[in-house]
From Swiss-Prot:
It comes from the Bacteria. The keyword rRNA processing applies. It comes from Yersinia pestis. It catalyses: pseudouridine(1915) in 23S rRNA + S-adenosyl-L-methionine = N(3)-methylpseudouridine(1915) in 23S rRNA + S-adenosyl-L-homocysteine + H(+). Signal peptide: none annotated. This is Ribosomal RNA large subunit methyltransferase H. S-adenosyl-L-methionine binds at residues 73, 104, 123-128. Its EC number is 2.1.1.177. GO terms for cellular component: cytoplasm. Its main location: cytoplasm. Belongs to the RNA methyltransferase RlmH family. Keywords: Cytoplasm, Methyltransferase, rRNA processing, S-adenosyl-L-methionine, Transferase.
Length: 156
C-alpha cells in the first residue's frame, strides 16, 4: 500500500519541508509515502472563490490514483485517537488499495473532493494552518505505523 498526501499549496516554509521530509524518510519501503502539491488558485478581493475551489478540487482528484481510497482531512470528519488511527492503517493495508489523503486550501475542500471521499478524518476541532497539517499527518501516520509494527517510536 502506498500513502499519498494531496495538498493545495506549493510554496511551504522551510520548517514545513524539513518536518514533513523527516517523517517521510522514516516510512518503510513497503509503505511509501509521497506528496502531490496542487497549485493554489489566485485569491484577490474579486476572486471567484467557488470557481477556485472547483479548480483545486479537479486538480486534486486528477492527482489521485484511479482506485485509491480517498480520505479528506476536514474539521467535521471523524477524530481518531492514535490507537484508532493504527487500526485504520491496518484496515487500509488489508483493503489492498493505495490511500490518498486530501488537504484543501484556505477555504477548505471542494465539494467534489468531499463527495469522492470514502472517509473524512478530523485532526482537531481547531482550524489549523494547512502547512502545519502536512507535518501533523505525516507524524501521526508514522506513529500509527510504529504501533502496528511494535516499533519503539510510540510509547503509551
Amino acid at each position: 500500500m502506498k500513502l499519498q498526501l494531496v495538498a493545495v499549496g506549493t510554496k511551504m516554509p522551510d520548517w514545513v519541508q524539513t518536518g514533513f521530509i523527516e517523517y517521510l524518510r522514516r516510512f518503510p519501503k513497503d509503505m511509501p509515502f509521497e506528496l502531490a502539491e496542487i497549485p493554489a488558485g489566485k485569491r484577490g478581493k474579486n476572486a471567484d472563490i467557488k470557481r477556485i475551489l472547483e479548480k483545486e478540487g479537479e486538480l486534486m482528484l486528477a492527482a489521485v490514483g484511479k482506485n485509491n481510497r480517498i480520505v479528506t482531512l476536514d474539521i467535521p470528519g471523524t477524530p481518531w485517537e492514535t490507537p484508532q488511527l493504527a487500526q485504520q492503517l491496518e484496515r487500509w493495508k488489508q483493503d489492498g488499495r493505495d490511500v490518498s489523503l486530501l488537504i484543501g486550501g484556505p477555504e477548505g475542500l471542494a465539494p467534489a473532493c468531499k463527495a469522492a471521499a470514502e472517509q473524512s478524518w478530523s485532526l482537531s476541532p481547531l482550524t489549523l494552518p494547512h502547512p502545519l497539517v502536512r507535518v501533523l499527518v505525516a507524524e501521526s501516520l508514522y506513529r500509527a505505523w510504529s504501533i502496528t509494527t511494535n516499533h519503539p517510536y510510540h510509547r503509551e
